[in-house]
Amino acid sequence: MDFSWTTGWEKAAADDDEAESAPAPAPPAPSPQEAAESMILVPGPRVVLSGLMRGDCRADDSVLFINAGGSATEGCEPSSKLSEDSFFEGGDAIETSEDIVEGGDYPSLYHSARYGNFSYKIDGLAPGDYFLDLHFAEIVNTYGPKGIRAFDVLVQEEKANTLTHILSELDVYAVVGGNRPLQVRDIRVTVESDSAIVINFKGVRGSPMVCGICIRKRVAMAVTDMVTEGNVLCKRCSAHTGNSPLQTRTSKLISKYEKQIEELTNQCNMKSDECYMAWSSVESTNQELERLKIELHQKVMQSDNIEQVVDRQADQLRSVSQKYENAKKLWAAAISNLENKIKAMKQEQTLLSLEAHDCANAVPDLSKMIGAVQTLVAQCEDLKLKYYEEMAKRKKLHNIVEETKGNIRVFCRCRPLSKDETSSGYKCAVDFDGAKDGDIAIVNGGAAKKTFKFDRVYMPTDNQADVYADASPLVTSVLDGYNVCIFAYGQTGTGKTFTMEGTERNRGVNYRTLEELFKIAEERKETVTYSISVSVLEVYNEQIRDLLASSPSSKKLEIKQASEGSHHVPGIVEAKVENIKEVWDVLQAGSNARAVGSNNVNEHSSRSHCMLCIMVRAENLMNGECTRSKLWLVDLAGSERLAKTDVQGERLKEAQNINRSLSALGDVISALATKNSHIPYRNSKLTHLLQDSLGGDSKALMFVQISPSNNDVSETLSSLNFASRVRRIELGPAKKQVDTAELQKVKQMLERAKQDIRLKDDSLRKLEDNCQNLENKAKGKEQFYKNLQEKVKELESQLDSKMHSQITSEKQQNELFGKLKEKEEMCTTLQQKIAEESEHKLRLQQQSESEIKELELKLKEQEHHRSVAESKIKELELKLKEQEHHRSVAESKAMEIGQELLETQRTEAMLQIKPRDLENNLQERTTLQDTNMILDSTNCMRVASTPGEAKAHLLTREEAMSEKEQHILRSSDSMNKKVTNNSSIVGAPEVVNEKKRKGDARNSSIGGELENQPVGSQNASRKRSLQGEPRLKRKSTEPLKNPGRVTATSKTAAATHKTGPVTRATRQQPAVNKTRGWVR
């Protein structure tokens, strides 16, 4: 959030009228630097719009540098030694491989970042003050827009338990753009003992993101200057000396700018408080505006809802009125129709009454009629018994006929050539010349034809109805209680599934069989009740799968044998079907769940044996006999050889299991044909399931499907050979010689019995129907007349209720129209109020925006003045640093000259032995003492800015001079002993006075010479004065062995102390006289 600094909320409030009359000028767009600095909420930190450089982080300052979201890196520079991302809580690490513009010396720092809502807790730091640097870069939303990511940064010192808001709504992209670095440096933090630094990143819009965190030591600048107001305290004599004009001016400027800085800081704090108050008021105004906007939106929504309700009610009213008009017309038409019908019914009633009277007259005597009916009932009972006997004979004869045809019959069906086979040039290899007699021949190249004999041969032109017509007699056996099995055999692609299942428009054997079952069951429903249930399963890889199960079960299905000898599969779904539609749904569900695959022979090849089991439970209502039969409709998998399909993997395993089960079926067929005592039903799941329907009293029908193409001759011959083996079951030579004449007689007797039964039934049924029709007609007419009267009454009552409802609806319509008008008036008033409130809020918002703009302008002016003052202070600091630099250079030259002087003095002390030279040395020391006083006063002013360095130089200088003076004193003592032996004690004061006079003259000459000497010569004289000073002090404090020498020394020290004020006075004279002096 951008905080705009103002000059005072009170003044802005006072200038509201002026702001309304004259709109404030639009402020200039802030620079990226200013935009970033406006997001900083504490003084001290600064913003850098570039990457990290080598000089930004020195070895003695750097404590910890965290590569957020990245790994540790090693380098020569301290800034290049980045530690891996640690100390964090929450967030995710992200990286980018794009180039970082202006990334500095270490652009890799900005290739990774920590992203999300997270915080850092950095512990293990030594107590003290630190600088915190944060590195940012927008590496996710590199194309913006502005404002897509804004977040706050808060720093908490753990023991303080307070969060300091450092950055507010920082938008990196708005400041520098995408893939560009941004640094916030010099955030001040303090660490106490056993505490940590907590940095919290809080998202305002989007998720926060940081690339690096650097912690540096903060070096405190110690203030050791001993400068007072207008004076400098001398380190040597503790005397207050006057400042030079430049120093005085500098100190005044410094104090002046410090006061200005303090005032500006106070003003800035005051303006920040005022800005915060203004911002809070603006926020409250914005919140109030938002609240009013929400209320306005709610009012608009309410008005819209009211309008919608009114429109809806109006539509309902119109629809009700239209319905009423339509109903009114319909009821009028219905009433007219009913009146016409009533008239016609009255006419019919009169006619029926006349017919009833005629019938009553035509009916003979009632007793005769009763006798005739009783005789008819007796005849009916006799006919029923004969009918049951004939039915039993019919069943027996039907089964005899079926058994004469053979228990297992084989039908051969050949499909037509496909388009692909015709286009590939394949020809028909099947000869259908003897198809009517059941013969079929196969032409195999140049070899002779091979002929096969079957019960029925279907040509490619025969349809599904023709095929089923020969299989339908077996359906009757199922209803009579026999187990029946119908299965289709042949290679893949020969039409087995088409024959058994068919399509929705061209049904197969399965559907037609069930349809025939329901048809016959409907015909026999008066004498026999049937319950039909269907199960669909498949044998896939020698495993039984229930195709009607809603979800596949992991439990294997096994075949069990019941106590009565039948076989069943526990757990399989048996769907009870009541009509043919349910049958088709069950067949479709099973067909869709069947395993299908592709191979070289057929793209959609059935890879399992599909078995449809129809369970029929019958109960004879006449004699109570119950039967339970089973019909198996089996669509076998393809019988082609493995070499032809060329399959691998899972398809190979499927083909092997299919061939194994078909081989087991062939073994069962062979055992049945040869009448073996053991039939291997259990060698396969297929034969085990069909054990009840193969052999014994069961009946079986096999469809062998063949291909007419000469490309499939080998598979066709294999299928026909297998079918021939099946046909030989129960068809020995003796059974083929059936007496057809006797069979014809039996058929004729059966037909005559059926015709007699039909004639008797028809005559009986006609008599009964005539009686019942006469009675029912009379009753029906009466009941119909009563119903018509009741309907007329109901229609009249409904008409009355409709009229009443129409009246009430008209009243409601009038009330709704009134309410609608009231609501429209309320909506108009609400819209006017809302418009007025919105205009008032817009005015308030414009006023607040103009005030904020004025405050921003004033804040920028204050910041400009402050920057100017800071620039002036920096210039003064640079000048002071230059002066200090010149002073340090002069002192270094003075030290060099002092060292040279020490060496020369040592050589003079060893060579000069005469008293006269000693006197000259004493005179030089007095002059050096005077010059030392002068140089001390001047140097104290110059060295005031760097007292620590001056003090160090003086201490070293005094130690060196004290050592030199001790050496000179020792040599002078030895020489003084020799002089005292040759001279008297009385002459000592004269010598001292003469030395005093010479010292005064030399001091005056040195004072005049110092002004004209360069800096190097002045420093040399200053060094000599420093060397002479400790010797004088030592003479005044240490006792001497020669009493006469003590008197001279004390007088000399006294004279030296007396000349001190004179030297101070003469120090200021060279500025006036400017004379040039010479030193001997």
Curated annotation (Swiss-Prot):
GO BP term (any one): microtubule-based process
Coiled-coil positions: 247-355, 736-893
GO MF term set: ATP binding; microtubule binding; microtubule motor activity
Annotated InterPro entries: Kinesin-like_fam, Kinesin_motor_CS, Kinesin_motor_dom, Kinesin_motor_dom_sf, Malectin_dom, P-loop_NTPase
Any Pfam family hit: Kinesin
Entry-linked Gene3D superfamilies: Galactose-binding lectin (2.60.120.430), Kinesin motor domain (3.40.850.10)
Binding-site residues, ATP: 490-497
Extent of Polar residues compositional bias: 971-985
This protein's name: Kinesin-like protein KIN-14E
Species assigned in the record: Oryza sativa subsp. japonica (Rice)
